[in-house]
Amino acid sequence: MKRLLQKIYHCSKVYGFTAAGAVAIVGIVIYERSRNNPVFSSWTTNHDPSVKWDYNWDKREPESVIKPPKETATDDEKLQYKEKLKKVPTATRHIILIRHGQYYDRESLDINRKLTDLGREQAQLTGARLVDMNYPWSKLICSTMTRAQETADIIHKQLPDLPREECDLLREGAPIPPEPPSGNWRPEKQFYKDGARIEAAFRKYFHRADPEQTNDSYEIVVCHANVIRYFVCRALQFPPEGWLRISLNHASITWLYIRPNGRVGLRTLGEAGFMPVNKVSVL
């Protein structure tokens, strides 16, 4: 502003502007600048999110699953289409992700990577926690890796009536190259192979309820840290490359829910507060 005033003063001397004329010019310049740089009373008055929520992230919006009528369709066919669009989900899906307990991670073969004594205690504590929560659990799903199966076995003994299934898609792996990069180098083909599988697992288990589902569901999924961290980023529509910045304790509980309209929320991330301090571990 000081330099601007100096220039105007110089011009007034050279071109013979009057003082009043110079003041008028200054006023016009200040006014134009204020229009280009408005000041708001709060950031919320004119806030545009950098990334907007994709409501059709699971491709289950009614318009995506119901075939539209042809241009030559009759009025009755068009009316039927509109009625089908009104049939939308009403239930919420709760997905409880549980990391396996501590295990012997220095073994090379999966069959030998069993739970340690501490890992078995952790799984027992998590099972007891699920019992105390007393939700109408729908089913128990687990990875086919040894440490996940052993964790699921211990939990299932405390919830014996719960239907159980296993899924190879939930096996541990490298979902996507992390950002910033990890100090542990991995060949690109590993991300290429594991990433597609873990993404397939996400698409299989993460979606809003079907319109036919009338009650909220509570599914328990026992799997692995990398898989869970990737799921959290994808479900919340955060950059998935950030998965490695999240840390999860062994046998911890991560709770995501999917509303009928496609909104997703995170209730807990890596909850292990139900364990005594000396039973908590991450590696």
What are the residue ranges of the model-derived segments?
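Active-site metal-binding loops of divalent metal-dependent hydrolases
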Residues: G101, A225, A272
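Domain-level recognition of soluble alpha/beta enzyme cores
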Residues: P239-G265
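Acidic, His/Gly-rich catalytic cores of divalent-metal-dependent hydrolytic chemistry
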Residues: T268-L283
